[in-house]
């Protein structure tokens, strides 16, 4: 029985050692410098709309240019009715290492006064990068998740967004973007969230596998790694490195407050220094009424209109709670819930604690 207990204890200790706390793969917390997607954008026309198009000047100009490319010229003094056409902006993400001939998804958005893009087809549109070069061409039928309808009396109902659609695999890559992946003796990992401790641990993890001096933490974001020159070896090398697990550093104490929605997110390491808080909720209601005094019939008088304001003030009794040294997140939440504070009250309390120097964390209001 004693041997069985010792074996069970050993198994439990091994399981604890085999599961590092907050260990993440390098590929999940960092990216390789230069290996990224690129944004593409273009301008084009959607045709075939069921009367939900537009008659804007730039749509008319684009429509004339398109017909001119096919040898059809419209007199300048004539303006054709084209309510089945809409001018659109087309954008897409060009993935890293995308090759010519591969297909990408594109998003189409109306830039004019079109009521909807349902049932439309995007005409051939060039997608350009930030340097003005064409990297892809988009074309195809739109998939629109929104719906819009309008009655004869002007009433209208809109579900979701009918002026934005997508074309899965609607773009064809025409040009490759060079990444510089194999042009240097070094590769650099950039952490998604900068942290000196995590960068140091990443470099140590790589050095423990490959050898001392292979990886070097440059700053809180970047870790530079020596890599093989041969491309086939470099791919295998990066595949091994990106699957290494690194124990991330504990996050800094932060409190994120969204004043518009009342959302409050409190980090685990937030603590409070000794403080006492009293907060009372005051509600002020102002109502404006108008009194109309009419003169008696056949009397020589005028109607008098006098405004009347009614102001009502309701204030709850202030409640006080005390934070002792070492108060943690759980204590803070429990104390606030006990007094029944609303999100707006909680935000006011947090701001006051920060100003008083009793909050050991960064308060960020978004």
From Swiss-Prot:
InterPro entries in UniProt = Flag_FlgI
Q: Which residues form a coiled coil?
A: none
Q: Name one GO cellular component term.
A: outer membrane-bounded periplasmic space
Question: Has UniProt tagged this entry with the keyword Methyltransferase?
Answer: no
Tell me which UniProt keywords the record has, alphabetically: Bacterial flagellum, Periplasm, Signal
As given in the record, the signal peptide range reads: 1-23
Location in the cell? Periplasm; Bacterial flagellum basal body
Q: Spell out the Pfam families in the cross-references.
A: FlgI
Please provide the Gene Ontology terms (biological process) for this protein: bacterial-type flagellum-dependent cell motility
GO MF terms, alphabetically ordered: structural molecule activity
The entry's function note states: Assembles around the rod to form the L-ring and probably protects the motor/basal body from shearing forces during rotation.
What is said about its interaction partners and assembly? The basal body constitutes a major portion of the flagellar organelle and consists of four rings (L,P,S, and M) mounted on a central rod.
What PANTHER family does the annotation carry?
FLAGELLAR P-RING PERIPLASMIC PROTEIN FLGI, FLAGELLAR P-RING PROTEIN
Family stated for the protein in its record: Belongs to the FlgI family.
Q: What is this protein called?
A: Flagellar P-ring protein
Q: Which organism is it from?
A: Idiomarina loihiensis (strain ATCC BAA-735 / DSM 15497 / L2-TR)
The UniProt gene name for this protein comes to flgI
């Amino acid at each position: 029985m004693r041997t069985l207990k010792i074996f069970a204890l050993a198994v439990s200790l091994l399981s604890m050692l085999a599961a590092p706390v907050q260990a993440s793969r390098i590929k999940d917390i960092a990216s390789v410098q230069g290996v990224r997607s690129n944004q593409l954008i273009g301008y084009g026309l959607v045709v075939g709309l069921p009367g939900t198009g537009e008659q804007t000047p730039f749509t008319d100009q684009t429509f004339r240019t398109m017909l001119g490319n096919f040898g059809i010229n419209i007199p300048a003094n004539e303006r054709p009715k084209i309510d089945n056409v809409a001018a659109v902006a087309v954008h897409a993400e060009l993935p890293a290492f995308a090759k010519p001939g591969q297909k990408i998804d594109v998003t189409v958005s109306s830039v004019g006064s079109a009521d909807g893009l349902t049932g439309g087809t995007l005409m051939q549109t060039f997608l350009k990068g930030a340097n003005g070069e064409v990297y892809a061409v988009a074309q195809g039928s739109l998939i629109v998740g929104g719906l819009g309808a309008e009655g004869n009396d002007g009433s209208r109902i809109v579900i979701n967004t009918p002026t934005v659609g997508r074309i899965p695999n609607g773009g064809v890559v025409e040009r490759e973007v060079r990444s510089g992946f194999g042009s240097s003796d070094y590769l650099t990992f950039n952490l998604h969230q900068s942290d000196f401790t995590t960068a140091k641990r990443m470099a140590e993890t790589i050095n423990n596998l490959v050898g001392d001096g292979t990886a070097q933490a440059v700053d809180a974001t970047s870790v530079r790694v020596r890599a093989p020159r041969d491309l086939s070896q470099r791919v295998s090398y990066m595949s091994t490195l990106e699957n290494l697990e690194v124990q991330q550093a504990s996050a800094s104490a932060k409190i994120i407050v969204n004043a518009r929605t009342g959302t409050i997110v409190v980090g685990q390491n937030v603590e409070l220094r000794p403080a006492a808080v009293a907060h009372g909720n005051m509600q002020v209601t102002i109502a404006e009424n108008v009194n109309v005094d009419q003169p008696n019939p056949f009397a020589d008088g005028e109607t008098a209109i006098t405004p009347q304001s009614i102001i009502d003030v309701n204030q709850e009794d202030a409640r006080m709670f005390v934070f002792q040294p070492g108060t943690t997140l759980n204590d803070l939440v429990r104390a606030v819930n006990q007094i029944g504070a609303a999100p707006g009250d909680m935000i006011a309390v947090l701001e006051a604690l920060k100003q008083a120097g009793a909050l050991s964390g960064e308060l960020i209001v978004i």
